[in-house]
C-alpha cells in the first residue's frame, strides 16, 4: 500500500508566510498583476506609500493600487488547515479585540468578529472531538434496479455513535471494531465513506476535508467484513513426456546443496536409434543418395561409401581420434 508523502511545515513556510510581517497569512490578499500574496493589513499599509509590489516591483496601479488586490480565501483556508492552532488562536484574538472595542464590532462579519458557529467552521483542530456514526455496509441495498436502493423493512441496520479525536486514524477504528465485535484475524475489516473504502492512514480530519463534511450531523462511516485472502502455492510445471530438461523455474533439491551436481535426465535412445543392421533412411525422398549422419547431411559416393570429408570423427577415452 502506497502511503502519502509527509513533509515538514517548515518546508512550506515560504509559501505560507508574509514577507512584510514575517508571520503566517491572516486574511490573505493577492495582487492581481503578479499574484504575490500578503496579509491584508500588511499590504494595505504598504500600498499607502508605494504603488509597486514588495517582491517583484511590478506596478500595482498608477493611482489607486487598492483596486488591484483581491482577498484569497482559498489560500487562507490552506494556511489555517496546515498550521495547527492558527485558526483557533486568531478567532480568540478577534473576540478579545472586539470585546474591548464593541463599537467596531458592528461593521464586520461573524468570522471577522471571531464568532464562528460549528456549522460554519471550515477548520478542524487536531485535538478537536468529532462525532461519527458507523454502521454495517449492506451491499444488497445498492444492487437495486436502475441504481435505485432497495427499501428493506425487515432488516434494520444498527448505527453506533462515537466521539473520537480528529487525529485518530482509520487503522485505529478498525482495531476498535475488531476488539468490540470479536472478529477473528482471518477476516478483513474495511472502513468506508458511502461505498468507497478508506486508507488506513487517513485521519478523521482528512476524511472530513476530503468529503467536505459540514458538521450538520455525525460523520457517516460504514464498515464491512470480508474473509482474508489465502495464499495459493503455485505448482511447478511437470516435465515433458519426452523426458527433456526440467525448467529453470522448478526448484531442485539437489541444486540447493553446494556439493551436489545438478542431474539432467538424458533422452532415451533405445527406441529412437536404429540398430547397426538397419539401413539409414534418407530424409530427402527426392534425393535418395543424401542421408543424415548425426544430424549432418552427407553425400554417398558411387561405390556406396561415404566420402572422407563426411566421415564422423570419434574420440576415444585416451584422447586418440579415429574415423568412423
Swiss-Prot record:
The keyword Ubl conjugation does not apply. Residues 280-295, 303-324 have a biased composition (Polar residues). Residues 256-279 have a biased composition (Low complexity). InterPro entries: RAWUL, Znf_RING, Znf_RING/FYVE/PHD, Znf_RING_CS. GO terms for molecular function: promoter-specific chromatin binding; zinc ion binding. It comes from the Eukaryota. It is found in: Nucleus. One of its GO terms (cellular component) is PRC1 complex. PANTHER family: POLYCOMB COMPLEX PROTEIN BMI-1, RING FINGER DOMAIN-CONTAINING, POLYCOMB GROUP COMPONENT. Component of a PRC1-like complex. Homodimer. Interacts with cbx2. This is Polycomb complex protein BMI-1-B. It comes from Danio rerio (Zebrafish).
Amino acid at each position: 500500500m502506497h502511503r502519502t508523502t509527509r513533509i515538514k511545515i517548515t518546508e512550506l513556510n515560504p509559501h505560507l508566510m508574509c514577507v512584510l510581517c514575517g508571520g503566517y497569512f491572516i486574511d490573505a490578499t493577492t495582487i492581481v498583476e503578479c499574484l504575490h500574496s500578503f496579509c491584508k493589513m500588511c499590504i494595505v499599509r504598504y500600498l499607502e506609500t508605494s504603488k509597486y509590489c514588495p517582491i517583484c516591483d511590478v506596478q500595482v496601479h498608477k493611482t489607486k493600487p487598492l483596486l488591484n488586490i483581491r482577498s484569497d480565501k482559498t489560500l487562507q483556508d490552506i494556511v489555517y488547515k496546515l498550521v495547527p492552532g492558527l485558526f483557533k488562536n486568531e478567532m480568540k484574538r478577534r473576540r478579545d479585540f472586539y470585546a474591548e472595542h464593541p463599537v467596531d464590532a458592528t461593521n464586520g462579519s461573524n468570522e471577522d468578529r471571531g464568532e464562528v458557529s460549528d456549522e460554519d467552521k471550515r477548520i478542524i483542530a487536531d485535538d478537536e472531538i468529532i462525532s461519527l456514526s458507523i454502521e454495517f455496509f449492506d451491499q444488497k441495498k445498492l444492487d437495486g434496479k436502475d441504481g435505485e436502493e432497495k427499501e428493506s423493512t425487515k432488516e434494520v441496520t444498527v448505527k453506533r455513535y462515537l466521539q473520537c479525536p480528529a487525529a485518530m486514524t482509520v487503522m485505529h477504528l478498525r482495531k476498535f471494531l475488531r476488539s468490540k465485535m470479536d472478529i477473528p484475524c482471518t477476516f478483513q475489516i474495511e472502513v468506508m465513506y458511502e461505498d468507497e473504502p478508506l486508507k488506513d492512514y487517513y485521519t478523521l480530519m482528512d476524511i472530513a476535508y476530503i468529503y467536505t463534511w459540514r458538521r450538520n450531523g455525525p460523520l457517516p462511516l460504514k464498515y464491512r467484513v470480508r474473509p482474508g485472502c489465502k495464499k495459493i502455492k503455485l505448482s511447478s510445471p511437470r516435465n515433458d513426456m519426452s523426458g527433456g530438461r526440467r525448467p529453470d523455474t522448478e526448484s531442485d533439491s539437489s541444486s540447493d546443496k553446494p556439493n551436489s551436481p545438478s542431474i539432467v535426465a538424458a533422452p532415451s535412445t533405445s527406441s529412437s536409434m536404429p540398430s547397426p543392421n538397419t539401413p539409414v533412411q534418407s530424409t530427402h525422398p527426392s534425393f535418395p543418395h543424401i542421408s543424415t549422419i548425426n544430424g549432418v547431411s552427407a553425400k554417398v559416393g558411387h561405390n556406396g561409401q561415404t566420402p572422407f570429408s563426411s566421415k564422423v570423427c570419434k574420440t576415444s577415452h585416451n584422447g586418440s581420434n579415429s574415423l568412423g
